[in-house]
Amino acid sequence: MTAQHLFQPFRLKSLELKNRIVMAPMTRSFSPEGVPTPKVADYYARRAEGEVGLIVSEGTVVNRPASSNDPNIPHFYGERPLAGWKAVIDKVRAVRGVMAPQLWHMGVVAPKPSGWLPPAPFEGPSGYVAPGKIGGVAMTEHDIAETVQAFAQAAADAKTLGFNAVEIHGAHGYLIDQFFWHPTNQRTDGYGGQTLAERARFAVEIIRAVRQAIGPDFPISLRISQWKLQDYAAKLATTPQEMEAWLVPLAEAGVDLFHCSQRRFWDPEFTGSDLNFAGWAKKLTGKSTITVGSVGLSGDFLAAFQGETSTPRSLDELLRRFDRGDFDLVAVGRPLLADAGWSRKIHEGRSSELNNFSKEALATLS
């Protein structure tokens, strides 16, 4: 099968991409005191030069006292961090790149081994870091309202700085996902509930506020997942009906693009169909979707981060699903850490030149 189909242009509202390859957001922790450095700008610009269609930044936290557990994760608020991000997007656009920041609040998380702590307790829907385990405080309705506005302000700043779209991180067991997930959301007010649709209210309010802040034509991507860092086997939606009740209100609130995170993109989401998560999200909402999960590599991220070297893998199954129309865009993570020119090599048919991935690639901004 030919990968040339991935190099068709794509348009979504004001977003125009030269191809369907997305750089997946990957935490790098190279922004001391939350400020992206010139090396961060160079790192992203190299991927733009390497023919990535859309770069989604590493998660960058919104303006809450405990939105991060790492002083080297970039902020998306404050004069110095925003100046750092302005330098990033200017450098990316200078090489005709297209980029969206991924706006993030980590929620209730474990402290880093270094012992660094934010200036306030970690916050979440009910204070749970994992099922049955308290690790922070429950947010008040005032906290929730301020967090909604923090996301909206960050999105407005992204547009002002010159980014092309914005992504909201609603996956992997972080704050928004902690509201989605019943074991970490035990609230009895309007932000809790027995159904996933009820627990999606917080995310719906964020999306609405972001849409109001950026206007109708600036695209909003929402990253979502079934799995959590706290439980890789977790399932928010166990049926297509539950998934529809979860995602349709988010689409109606303003999501243009669902970024559907799986550990392995080829895994079917429900029995009776080989559609993956992105395929079901597109079918149920009619919105464009991004698939992601071990694209182009032999092993998933867990094995890789535990020291196993991942080798290049055929794209045939990915292309079969893409050609069928299951999803619109393809996010690539670790291959782009190992090789900034991955997309160009795929485009030019140079797959024999692709690099392996090992965890040593995480040690630098190469």
What does each model-identified segment do?
Residues M1-S366:
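Flavin-dependent oxidoreductase catalytic cores
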